[in-house]
């Protein structure tokens, strides 16, 4: 698709890939940065991107939680995406806490960063 690597899917200038291996947040982010140039855990910026992401992840993972690149790196500091993208779209399920993850029903959940979870990597096309 467009300029994505084999096995990656294209959507609006970015490439995405769902990984069916469970890692904690830090290891998943590190994996994404090593897997592809400028790769990171997914950051989401619109309902359309969320719908695309879900159409990609749900057939593979069914109902589950996937890591996304949102975490509060230091206590009392603003939330940010791991790729430094602006937090211009939000879908918190309850209150934001330490780390962000995402389920297949568009809700964002706080989760223990050390829990192994599936994840989606994203990189510029």
UniProtKB/Swiss-Prot annotation:
Disulfide bond found in the keyword field: yes
Tissues with expression: Expressed by the venom gland.
Family: Belongs to the snaclec family.
Chain segments annotated as transmembrane: none
PROSITE patterns hit by this protein: C_TYPE_LECTIN_1, C_TYPE_LECTIN_2
Compartments reported by the entry: Secreted
Source species of the chain: Daboia palaestinae
Protein name as it appears in the record: Snaclec VP12 subunit B
This protein's UniProt keywords: Disulfide bond, Hemostasis impairing toxin, Platelet aggregation inhibiting toxin, Secreted, Toxin
Record-annotated C-type lectin domain positions: 11-122
Function: Inhibits integrin alpha-2/beta-1- (ITGA2/ITGB1) dependent melanoma metastasis.
GO molecular function, a single term: toxin activity
Subunit structure: Heterodimer of subunits alpha and beta; disulfide-linked.
GO cellular-component term (any): extracellular region
Record-linked SMART domains: CLECT (SM00034)
Record carries keyword Secreted: yes
Species lineage: Eukaryota, Metazoa, Chordata, Craniata, Vertebrata
InterPro entries in alphabetical order: C-type_lectin-like, C-type_lectin-like/link_sf, C-type_lectin/snaclec_domain, C-type_lectin_CS, CTDL_fold
Disulfide-bond pairs as recorded: 4-15, 32-121, 98-113
Pfam families linked: Lectin_C (PF00059)
